[in-house]
UniProtKB/Swiss-Prot annotation:
Cofactor note: Binds 1 Ca(2+) ion per subunit.
GO cellular component terms listed in the entry, alphabetical order: extracellular space
Peptidase S1 domain location: 27-264
PANTHER family: CHYMOTRYPSIN-LIKE ELASTASE FAMILY MEMBER (PTHR24257), CHYMOTRYPSIN-LIKE ELASTASE FAMILY MEMBER 1 (PTHR24257:SF0)
Pfam families per the UniProt record, alphabetical: Trypsin
Recorded name of the encoding gene: CELA1
Name of the protein in question: Chymotrypsin-like elastase family member 1
């Protein structure tokens, strides 16, 4: 039986801003996604006491590789990946369950300094999954691609629908338009906490990520196609849907070379 557990908060201490990052992100202010409408979305789960616990999201980028956040996997656990899922509390008949064989965390990731960036990891699966209408590979952006301000994006994930709210059992989605680096790094937003290797989205005080489903994708519409521009990283310690504190993501386009080299060498 699948159980849920919200990870302990990882807080960046000693930073100059009062708005400390909280690296547990779930979808707030969203709606239930259409069944398997985001077929590259995965559920990352770990084993404890004979039960599997959903802990993070992620993106299937090869048939045997998943992209997620480094902070999701930087403590030793037995992990598995579930693809083709929609309702975590029941068997939809479309799921595939695969063990994680190897975890590659970015070498510069520092769990004590979330604002430094590099919150990205790749998971090699024990076997390749089967692609079908419920399971597809996420499309990654070109290396160095930068989103224009206010680009249409969606965050997806399982979990809390409001700060301190109940966990959602079905996949949620929320519209989060991108916020460019110049705005997001300004003093009235995130300031120096945000780096140019990150993507900001949302910040309207209504829709956001929130505790528990980091690692999942930010899907953005560019030239008529959705691609995964972000890996959910952190939100404000003040709350999930705080105005002018957009959800912050690892910018995937900053790590394309690292992704390709890691997969090729493993």
């Amino acid at each position: 039986m699948l159980r849920f557990l919200v990870f302990a908060t990882l807080v960046l201490y000693g930073h100059s801003t009062q708005d400390f990052p909280e690296t547990n992100a779930r979808v707030v202010g969203g709606t239930e996604a259409g069944r398997n409408s985001w077929p590259s979305q995965i559920s990352l789960q770990y084993l404890s006491g004979g039960s599997w616990y959903h802990t993070c999201g992620g993106t299937l980028i090869r048939q045997n590789w998943v992209m997620t956040a480094a902070h999701c996997v930087d403590s030793p656990k037995t992990f598995r990946v579930v693809v083709g899922d929609h309702n975590l509390s029941q068997n939809d008949g479309t799921e595939q369950y695969v063990s994680v064989q190897k975890i590659v965390v970015h070498p510069y990731w520092n769990s004590n300094n979330v604002a430094a960036g590099y919150d990205i990891a790749l998971l090699r699966l024990a076997q390749s999954v089967t692609l079908n209408s419920y399971v597809q590979l996420g499309v990654l952006p070109q290396e160095g691609a930068i989103l224009a301000n206010d680009s249409p994006c969606y965050i997806t994930g399982w979990g809390r629908t409001k700060t301190n709210g109940q966990l959602a059992q079905t996949l949620q989605q929320a519209y989060l338009p991108s916020v460019d680096y110049a705005i997001c790094s300004s003093s009235s937003y995130w300031g120096s906490t945000v780096k140019n290797t990150m993507v900001c989205a949302g910040g309207d005080g209504v829709h956001s990520g929130c505790q528990g489903d980091s690692g999942g994708p930010l899907h953005c519409l560019v030239n008529g196609k959705y691609s995964v521009h972000g890996v959910t990283s952190f939100v404000s310690k003040q709350g999930c849907n705080v105005s002018r504190k957009p959800t912050v993501f690892t910018r995937v386009s900053a790590y394309i070379s690292w992704i390709n080299k890691t997969i090729a060498s493993n």
